[in-house]
Amino acid sequence: MNKLIIPILTALLLFSGNVFALSSSEKENNEKNESMSWTVDRDHSSINFSVRHFFTPVNGRFNDFEADIQFNPDAPENSRIDVTIPISYINTENARRDNHLASEDFFNSEQWPTMRFVSTNIQKTDDNEYVAVGELTIRDVTKTVELPFELLGIMEHPMMDDTQVAGIAASTKIKRTDFGVGVGDWAATLVVGDDVDITINLELTTKI
């Protein structure tokens, strides 16, 4: 009888050990693939744009925005970016121009007060290089755009406990007329150019 029990117990112990090892490995893989929720440090982040006026680039930015960023550099396929920008926060260092841009001639912020980008797919393209494909909505037009971005770095925050800090830089180009920004005489691109260069710099933190 003992000769039968000992092999059975040994087999059970080996089986339970394998199950535990598989469970631990599966847990580690799940944790590695989980997306992390990041908070934007507004004091060290910016969304900027540049558009030509006749021949000269004119720069602007949006002073505030809302961002929901779920990002895991090791599992970009499980990541998501959702950014909403109130048009009223446009700033080109010229109040008259800012008011004109918010008017019916361009963004028409009374009817469409925000623009929004929501990613549908994020892929890694190279070391620390990614591209977020998503839907950009400006006014009443939604189009698919690509937003390439670089993970500048990620580290434990030296001044905040149990926190990581990361930096992201992104850039893309869109045509304002694709989104109906500029109506009537302002749809022409001789005075205000069609190409809009967008650059985004984000400092992010997450709890660990």
Give a label for each model feature.
Residues 1-8:
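Bacterial N-terminal signal peptides that target proteins for export
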Residues 8-14:
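Hydrophobic alpha-helical targeting segments used for export or membrane insertion
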Residues 21-208:
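Low-complexity, acidic/polar, glycine-enriched regions of mature
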Residues 16-18:
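N-terminal signal peptide c-region/cleavage motif recognized by signal peptidases
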